[in-house]
């Protein structure tokens, strides 16, 4: 079997009991063998400041290296005020700068938005996609992943307990794996 593609999973929530972090862990356990998922933490990143471009903070350099080393990126995000959380936008900015040296460039991406509400983070999902287009990240278009009603989605072990949602996520992950194979750069 070929070496699994490395997928950086970026969770857009810092909350300790985050539904999005639970989702990231659940999909890690569900991922097909062709993908190796790793959650890349964003909570330690300083706010992006262009004045630091010549000598970026160590945390920013380490984060950017992890993104650069990945074959693809999977964003798992909540919705705050019909958009992405500030911490996620900051992480995107940190790894995209200085201009022309983006770690995101050309990396296939997927977006899963997770919410306890009925619309499953629709606003955040679409707003994030706009930024990813600018960053030259080919984003999986179908299936779109809006996971609503997430408050009672996970069992005590952290697995997805709703059969319909599990089936959908299996379909999404299979499509994402195929997308990564079609659009990622050839392994070195």
List the predicted regions and their residue ranges.
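N-terminal beta-loop-helix "entrance" segment that forms/cooperates
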Residues: 42-59, 154
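A general structural signal for well-ordered alpha-helical segments in protein cores
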Residues: 7, 20, 24, 60, ...
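Glycine-rich phosphate/pyrophosphate-binding loop and the adjoining helix
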Residues: 2-4, 8, 49, 138-188
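N-terminal beta1-alpha1 ligand-phosphate binding loop
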Residues: 2-33
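A generic structural motif
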Residues: 32-38, 138
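Helix-loop-strand module that forms the ligand-binding subsite of alpha/beta enzymes
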Residues: 55-136
């Amino acid at each position: 079997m070929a070496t699994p593609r490395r997928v950086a999973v970026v969770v857009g929530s810092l909350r300790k009991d985050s539904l999005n972090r639970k989702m990231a862990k659940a999909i890690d356990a569900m991922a097909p063998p062709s993908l190796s998922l790793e959650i890349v933490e964003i909570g330690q990143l300083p706010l992006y400041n262009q004045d630091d471009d010549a000598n970026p903070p160590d945390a920013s350099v380490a984060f950017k290296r992890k993104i650069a080393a990945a074959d693809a990126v999977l964003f798992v995000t909540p919705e705050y005020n019909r958009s992405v959380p500030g911490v996620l936008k900051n992480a995107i900015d940190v790894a995209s700068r200085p201009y022309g040296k983006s770690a995101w460039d050309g990396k296939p991406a997927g977006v899963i938005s997770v919410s306890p509400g009925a619309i499953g983070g629709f606003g955040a999902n679409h707003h994030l996609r706009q930024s990813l287009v600018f960053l030259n990240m080919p984003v999986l278009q179908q299936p779109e992943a809006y996971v609503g009603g997430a408050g009672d989605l996970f069992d005590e072990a952290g697995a997805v307990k709703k059969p319909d949602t599990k089936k959908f996520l299996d379909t999404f992950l299979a499509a994402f794996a195929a997308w990564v194979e079609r659009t990622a750069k050839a392994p070195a």
